[in-house]
Amino acid sequence: MKKNLTEIVFILDRSGSMAGLEDDTIGGFNAMIQKQKGEDGEAYVSTVLFDNHTEVIHDRVDIQQIQPMTRKDYYVRGCTALLDAVGKSIHHIGNVHKYAREEDRPEKTIFVITTDGMENASREYTYDRVKKMIQHEQEKYGWEFLFLGANIDAAKEAARFGITEDRAASYHADHQGTAVIYEAMSEAVCNVRASRPVSADWKRRVDEDYKKRNK
C-alpha cells in the first residue's frame, strides 16, 4: 500500500431534478476540492456525473491538478441511473487497484454518493449486485462509502446498497442544503485522509439542517 495516498471517488447526480442547483453544486464541489488541496497527503480524485448515462470528468487525477468545475462540466438532464454509476465506478477502481503494483495501491479509498431522487433508469446493475460489490470492498479492503440523498429516505435507500445508517444522510435539495452536504463531505474526506475514523459526527450539521427545516 502507498501510505498517505487516498482514492476519492465522487458520484454526483446531475439528473433533470437538479435544475436550479447547478451553481450551488459547482460552487460546493469547487470549495471542497480547494480545501482538500491544502490537506496533508496525496489524493487521486475521480468525479462521476450521472443521469440516464454516466460521464467521468476526472479519472484518478492528482488532486493538485484538478481544475475548477464549470457549467460546461456540470449541467442537468435526464433520469437517475444511480446503480449503473455506482456499479461501474466500483468496478473500474477495483480493477485499477487489482492490477496496480502493491507500492502504488492507495492506502485508503472513499466513495461519496449524492442523489436527489430514487433510482429509475439503470440498465446494467441491480441493487443486489451493487450491494454485494460494496460489501466486498468494505469487508476485504476497508473502503468507505457515504450516501447523501434528497427527496428520499436516505438511510433506507443506502441500506439497499449495503451502506449503514451512520454513513447516510438526508438533505434538502436547495441552496443551504447543498452547501451543508459539501461541507460534510469535506470533513469526512479529511478524516479518511488523516486515517481517523469517520464518526457519526461527520453528518451532524446535515442532520440538524434537515430536521430543522423538515416541517
Predicted features and spans:
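Acidic, low-complexity intrinsically disordered regions
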Residues: M1-K215
